[in-house]
Amino acid sequence: MWSRAASVRFRAPLDAGRSFASKANPQGKVQAAGLGTQAPRLVPQGSGRVSPAVIEHLERLALVNFGSREAVDRLEKAIAFADQLHAVDTDGVEPLESVLEDRCLYLRSDNVAEGSCAEELLQNSNHVVEEYFVAPPGNISLPDMVNKIPSSTAE
């Protein structure tokens, strides 16, 4: 049942969201930026191409770099595949929560075997800041300068 609700939610138009930013119009009145504006569609109907404006929007939202034509082609193929999934009839299909739903899983008790091993675990990281792992956002790599900074746990 929840799969139908989720599919309806995912099929909502892209322009349904509203923004909290505001702009002043020529008369000096403030108008919400998201009201009355439409977000660009991912792929225009009947076309398999993604506009440069949408690519820039996705790069900003997802912190992913679509700098090459190959990356844009991969995005267009992924969108085409997702469009094929919309054609699948899932009426009457129970949602699957786990591939092991028909089996009884025996869980072990949650006991701490070894404590105070944070320093040992943080040694596995390339870069640590204030006892936290640092990872690059998306496929944008950390600057080379960051890798040269000594971590606080290395001695």
Swiss-Prot record:
A GO cellular component annotated for this chain's UniProt record is: mitochondrion
- Keyword annotations of the record: ATP-binding, Ligase, Mitochondrion, Nucleotide-binding, Protein biosynthesis, Transit peptide
Q: Which domain of life is it from?
A: Eukaryota
Span of the transit peptide along the chain: 1-20
Q: Give the enzyme's main class according to its UniProt record, as a single word.
A: ligase
Q: What InterPro entries does this protein's entry cite?
A: Asp/Glu-ADT_sf_sub_c, GatC
The disulfides recorded in the entry are none
UniProt subcellular location: Mitochondrion
Molecular-function annotations in GO: ATP binding; glutaminyl-tRNA synthase (glutamine-hydrolyzing) activity
Q: Which reaction does it catalyse?
A: L-glutamyl-tRNA(Gln) + L-glutamine + ATP + H2O = L-glutaminyl-tRNA(Gln) + L-glutamate + ADP + phosphate + H(+)
Similarity comment: family membership: Belongs to the GatC family.
NCBIfam families under this entry?
Answer: gatC
Quaternary structure, per UniProt, is: Subunit of the heterotrimeric GatCAB amidotransferase (AdT) complex, composed of A (QRSL1), B (GATB) and C (GATC) subunits.
**Could you tell me what this protein does?**
Allows the formation of correctly charged Gln-tRNA(Gln) through the transamidation of misacylated Glu-tRNA(Gln) in the mitochondria. The reaction takes place in the presence of glutamine and ATP through an activated gamma-phospho-Glu-tRNA(Gln).
Name listed for the protein in its UniProt record:
Glutamyl-tRNA(Gln) amidotransferase subunit C, mitochondrial
From which organism does this entry originate? Mus musculus
Which gene name belongs to this protein? Gatc
